[in-house]
């Protein structure tokens, strides 16, 4: 970034904004980069502004019981705000004086009185000087107010961010992501955009008072006729505005529905393609779009009437003000034109400026109140610790995640009893719930320094809550906690901040080369780092998207290990690691490198428990056991059932099995309706009322609004029947921060969350606490990662044994903080946060306009119709002007009654009726023509938007994954949210305004030129100057606007990133560093926004200066050349004054149109994406009139017999090579193997080796080469849909879209209810579905939040069974599954897919034991493909990965394999039909 010329600019340069010329020149000649932007001044820096406002806010908090944020803002910005307001008022006053001079010019102008001619010249000079003074006053004032609005926004942005980092976990659980994004984006933007209008709340009334006084001199009491009409018009506009808001609120819900489905489709596009659901998703979205467009049209029509009322009101204002006075008393020409000029100013003040000002104050005060409520929320309290303590002690600790839940649930129960549930069981959800259950109860233990405590327990036992309580995130209600307070923390879900790998590991702690290299080696990161060209300096984007889940987990662990702390809290750090890597890291890092440190490790692995000094097993929030492993074996022989979360499943009765599975439901609806409305059309306030606000009370158990995917702590496990808890506010089972959703489930789009968030997230109750405990990026295989291999490279760490070194002894007792803020440059933020820079021209090309016009054939005819109407209007005006002298001046030449011809009365008894009829006729004609011109235009433009959305949706659904993989989810979603909103809302009315204004200007210029041809000579260079100046400015302004838009991304991304890692930030004490990083992101955006405001004001001022020159020329040409009296001069000068404001408005509208057309360019870019089948985008869907079939029927030349393909499921893979992107590295190279029909194959390999990639390649979801055959049919010989239908898929990222159970299982409606129920019963879903009101018609929302992860897996199984697939692909199906559901899935696989080919990628060893063959992937190739016997007998990855105990489990398979046929090798011990039946849900 460069030094700003503003620092050395002169007063004149600042007044005329000439200091912006260098950036304008550079932007016109070349593409602007971030390095071309100027540094901001210290007065605009986020540090200074936030410190100033924070100081005043703290003062307000300390001095008053009811602090007001408006008072703090007033003390910071009031005097500058009022100073610019006074300057703005003086500029507006000149508008009221201009008509007086105009009237005097007309009055003094008389061809018979040559003496008065010199007065007219001087008055003309005065009139021109007024325009110059107004220009010099108005633009600095508007710029100053915009500048103050920007500073207020920056200060409040920073204040909100700092407050967010201080909020308690309880408060974060009550705030949705949509609320935070809305607070920062929608609310605070009002200060940027609206502060310049705020002063008109007092300027407009003063101006109206002044104008009414001046008009009283001319028209007396008739003045109030025009004012009354304007007031009625303003009230009518207010009513239309209210009606428009009503339609927009209704439409917001429909937009919400569409965007939620679209978001789910985009985030799960691989699953959509794998299931061949493209047409089904298109039909669902288009149906929602159709309903949305009906409301869009209604809102657009009302808004059009509101806008057009301003344009046509001028006729009636003059009609009601002048004609009654003229008919009764007669009127002179001077009064007519003076009144018209006054009415133009009066109309703007009453119908535009004052309503806008009132709305600005209303919105701004509402935003300030919301922010004020937010700033007073409860903060995180740092517990006081004993710094001399070296051990960890807990004494009788009890804790609750929520307080006051008893009253809430009692009310919820009462509300539920008053409703009717379809199954008739009103007590279903509350039968055995005990209120106010603690998450931890009476916890006591002690750990000596240097010991390893292993914490185990079932899902929801309170393990993570225990760590949170030690960290101070969960405040104990009883008991004491003692430790030194020097904590390091590794969360269960790895958190990666934007920056380099090195920055993520060091994390602000002082750098020690020896320690750093040792940690890298112990966490098995050497090999991964060596594969990056920049090594550990490679920049990781948002959430570490370029890394695999295992790599992210190891970096998070390395961060925790690198810090020199007294206590290390490790929350399930091995969740995403393969068995071999986990084993190595546990030995080298946990047991050796950290041998002298106190460690608390949350784990469920028996090997870890054996090596722990102490073991703490939690069950239902209480201590089940505390002691050593040997004591555990002696005292608690049944500990394995508590560790796994259940007793032996086969020991339960069928009734008890059903009860246990039912208890896994953590969300349920209180509504009795079969369909649920899950959209919020209004954003909730931050105001906390009552217990937690009415919204919280009403939605505490609602599956609609609460999507916190936490498990819960059981109060009484084995004695309870029915449903035991709910997630958002469980009663006897409280929060355990272990998500039951799949790790890859996206919570927010990966980029630009902000631009689309407020639109579609408002109706999805996503708490911030859930964001902190889940991952928004795919924790599985990364699409951009380097391939990880198991080959060990030369160690970068010291070669001594890790058990013999102490990496912490080289430092002081406590690491010093490393000040990184000075090392971070604003330009580096682009690598960390920015989306891909869009390759769109600086100015919208003519090709885009032409293509937009030709999208719909009707648009061309409508534009021609507008031109025809315009010509009729101009012709009518010219006819009136031609008749004007004959009618209005025919009596004047013969009149001798007038004492002074310059004040001759032009209204006579013979001409009054003619005037009345002509004026009314012309006014009505122009009004009717104007309405007929505008409505078809708006209607057609919305139709064009509908067509473009349809084409873009088709393109995305048909685009190959290799193309979609290069795009960010947020970028795609922005096309369907922000850009479609522009096409629907802004573009039609903006184009209408531009066309209307342009035609008004052209018409006025034509009329003036006809009256005075010399003026046409002055018009030509002025129009040319306008066009050239606009083109010159647009090149720079659009680039600055693009940079400003990109600059917003770091702000909101950093906010979301900080929230995800908030517990880590607090544990490491890195809040100041992240505040500094946030301020740098704010400063980066400020630099772009301030420069855009400055260049915009430079352009506006030049436009007005050009017009002032034009007006001077028109004035003196009229005065010096006109010799026929005051009538012609009055018309010319009045039209010229009107042209000034209208032309400037038209130019601004043209810039807005060009800016909005960039959205059209982006949409066209998506429409032009290639398709999977290589056909043009307009050829892969039926015509508009034809209805898409519910079933995709594809003819296959290889399958024209009576045989069903595939029949056996035999697969042959030959030389398969796979890439994620066209230009990317090959993830798999020359893979060849074959699978026999009905065989089960397990995929083995380290994290990131390409197992999931191989499954995607089978589905042709990647850029592949080679050949795959299924039952002899090659994938090149049939279509994609036919090929993919051969597979059943259970992906790592389970896809449940918002819709009914029926739609999720059968989106095309192919199967009857009887067939669906049969399959649901077969896979164990029947009892789950029957628990919900409406059963198959129950609406699932937000990714199926009412279902556990296991139930979602069963949904995928059911889809595969319904598809009659012969080949089943399973990608990590047991990840984060509770043991119950895992056992059911195993049994279902055995029964429902007994004759199918199964390909399984799995880290859990027991799940792999059922496979007959194993495919080992290493270094992008197949390293080994053998049977179990060969794998165990040779030194292989599989043999290294499994423990001796697991090898014993395989002995029956190995021994029996010599006696049994291949088809029975993988079969488990046969069960009777009765036993199998009992295991079903």
From Swiss-Prot:
Question: Could you tell me which residue ranges are on the Cytoplasmic side of the membrane?
Answer: 1-77, 147-195, 244-298, 359-858, 940-990, 1035-1095, 1152-1481
Q: Which residues carry a glycan? A: 894, 900
Query: Where does the ABC transmembrane type-1 domain lie?
Result: 81-365, 859-1155
Annotated ATP 1 binding lies at 401, 457-464, 492
**Residue(s) carrying Phosphoserine:** 548, 659, 669, 685, 699, 711, 736, 767, 790, 795, 813, 1457
Compartments, as annotated in UniProt: Apical cell membrane; Early endosome membrane; Cell membrane; Recycling endosome membrane
* Broad class of the protein's primary localization: membrane
Q: Enumerate the spans annotated as ABC transporter domain.
A: 423-645, 1211-1444
UniProt entry tagged with the keyword Repeat: yes
Residue spans, topological domain Extracellular = 99-122, 217-222, 320-339, 880-918, 1012-1013, 1117-1130
Residue ranges of the motif PDZ-binding: 1479-1481
GO MF assignments: ABC-type transporter activity; ATP binding; ATP hydrolysis activity; ATPase-coupled transmembrane transporter activity; bicarbonate transmembrane transporter activity; chloride channel activity; chloride channel inhibitor activity; chloride transmembrane transporter activity
Lipid-acceptor residues (S-palmitoyl cysteine): 523, 1396
One Pfam family name is CFTR_R
What segments bear the compositional bias annotation Acidic residues?
Answer: 1471-1481
In residue numbers, the region (Disordered R region) covers: 653-831
PTM-bearing positions, type Phosphothreonine: 716
Q: Its GO CC terms?
A: apical plasma membrane; chloride channel complex; cytosol; early endosome; early endosome membrane; endoplasmic reticulum membrane; membrane; nucleus
What does the record say about its membrane topology? Multi-pass membrane protein
What keywords does the record list, in alphabetical order?
ATP-binding, Cell membrane, Chloride, Chloride channel, Endoplasmic reticulum, Endosome, Glycoprotein, Ion channel, Ion transport, Isomerase, Isopeptide bond, Lipoprotein, Membrane, Nucleotide-binding, Nucleus, Palmitate, Phosphoprotein, Repeat, Transmembrane, Transmembrane helix, Transport, Ubl conjugation
Annotated region Interaction with GORASP2: the residues are 1387-1481
EC numbers, comma separated: 5.6.1.6
Q: What does this protein do?
A: Epithelial ion channel that plays an important role in the regulation of epithelial ion and water transport and fluid homeostasis. Mediates the transport of chloride ions across the cell membrane. Possesses an intrinsic ATPase activity and utilizes ATP to gate its channel; the passive flow of anions through the channel is gated by cycles of ATP binding and hydrolysis by the ATP-binding domains. The ion channel is also permeable to HCO(3)(-); selectivity depends on the extracellular chloride concentration.
- Quaternary organization: Monomer; does not require oligomerization for channel activity. May form oligomers in the membrane. Interacts with SLC26A3, SLC26A6 and NHERF1. Interacts with SHANK2. Interacts with MYO6. Interacts (via C-terminus) with GOPC (via PDZ domain); this promotes CFTR internalization and thereby decreases channel activity. Interacts with SLC4A7 through NHERF1. Found in a complex with MYO5B and RAB11A. Interacts with ANO1. Interacts with SLC26A8. Interacts with AHCYL1; the interaction increases CFTR activity. Interacts with CSE1L.
Name by which UniProt lists this protein: Cystic fibrosis transmembrane conductance regulator
Q: Which gene encodes it?
A: CFTR
